């Protein structure tokens, strides 16, 4: 089992211990270590206060000092070091009104969300598992630490995180945990949509997404999310992992809607991808010739095209017409892309200025149309991408 990331962080824990404090690995890295999965981020918990951590290490960043978290920079890596803490009453089902620093590991672990995430480990790889997290991991069960209703009342996002973990790990959800989710799911309306979107993005890429997505529907989670609340999400089916952006595009195409995406507070890149997914899905059923395929591959992001093609079963499950597989498939997409004479308009050897000078014409609506005609002619092989050849073609084929 790969311990390299733990070993890279070991000097931090040892330095904290050398100064008379406790320090442990904690959270997802320990869970994944117990499961034999690849480890990514290392989180450290300690009895030292943020001020004490800052006095021990020369290079620190107070990313969340008021909540007990200090980033320690070691060997050009950032390590999140958080003081043992007990959280005060939560407000709005999403954040504690304050935190109290404590010196006891048990008290820190009992505030965490799920038993599998409430295991600590020392530098000798000894596990501190007060809530039977290893047993739940072995039984492939997601269970809250303590009373589920209390954990979800503290932070409603834990319910979406639970479904995300189910999707990623293919675990079952403990009965009492699931029943608390059924009772309290409406509380996610108090959450920021940004936090929900982060979890949904991971959930949609999980290997067990079909089950988790069906739980989102049965628990009526979508009823309490901006954008989705206006839609009958029970009509949407997800049978395999897809991007969240593709899901939103599928919803738009299936219901033939053009709702504003602003309530989801997505990045400009995400919005651009969603709009292009919609255009691709609408264009796919109309491609029957190699010439049409060339224009299609030229016009759209081939990575997004491939994502849609890989998700063909999801489109079918939502009654969205797919592509003609003999003309449009992963191989023909790659071959067509490879042989395109140019990949965007910037590659074209003429521009609007050249055209206006050649035709002795002023700018107007005609210019955009002619540039598009030239693009298509080059992409489909009717004219080579050379200025003299293009202008000859314009003289013979274009009227303004």
Curated annotation (Swiss-Prot):
Which Pfam families does this chain map to? PolyA_pol, PolyA_pol_RNAbd, tRNA_NucTran2_2
A GO molecular function term, named singly, is: tRNA binding
Annotated S-S bridges: none
Report the EC code(s) recorded for this entry.
2.7.7.72
Q: Which residues bind Mg(2+)?
A: 41, 43
GO term, biological process aspect, one? RNA repair
User: Which reaction is this enzyme known to catalyze?
Assistant: a tRNA precursor + 2 CTP + ATP = a tRNA with a 3' CCA end + 3 diphosphate; a tRNA with a 3' CCA end + 2 CTP + ATP = a tRNA with a 3' CCACCA end + 3 diphosphate
The alphabetized UniProt keywords are: ATP-binding, Magnesium, Metal-binding, Nucleotide-binding, Nucleotidyltransferase, RNA repair, RNA-binding, Transferase, tRNA processing
The coenzyme or cofactor needed here is: Mg(2+)
Q: Where does CTP bind?
A: 28, 31, 112, 155, 158, 161, 164
Positions of ATP binding: 28, 31, 112, 155, 158, 161, 164
More info: A single active site specifically recognizes both ATP and CTP and is responsible for their addition.
Q: Which family does it belong to?
A: Belongs to the tRNA nucleotidyltransferase/poly(A) polymerase family. Bacterial CCA-adding enzyme type 3 subfamily.
What do we know about how this protein assembles, alone or with others? Homodimer.
Q: What is the role of the protein in this entry?
A: Catalyzes the addition and repair of the essential 3'-terminal CCA sequence in tRNAs without using a nucleic acid template. Adds these three nucleotides in the order of C, C, and A to the tRNA nucleotide-73, using CTP and ATP as substrates and producing inorganic pyrophosphate. tRNA 3'-terminal CCA addition is required both for tRNA processing and repair. Also involved in tRNA surveillance by mediating tandem CCA addition to generate a CCACCA at the 3' terminus of unstable tRNAs. While stable tRNAs receive only 3'-terminal CCA, unstable tRNAs are marked with CCACCA and rapidly degraded.
The name this protein carries in UniProt is CCA-adding enzyme
Q: Which gene encodes it?
A: cca
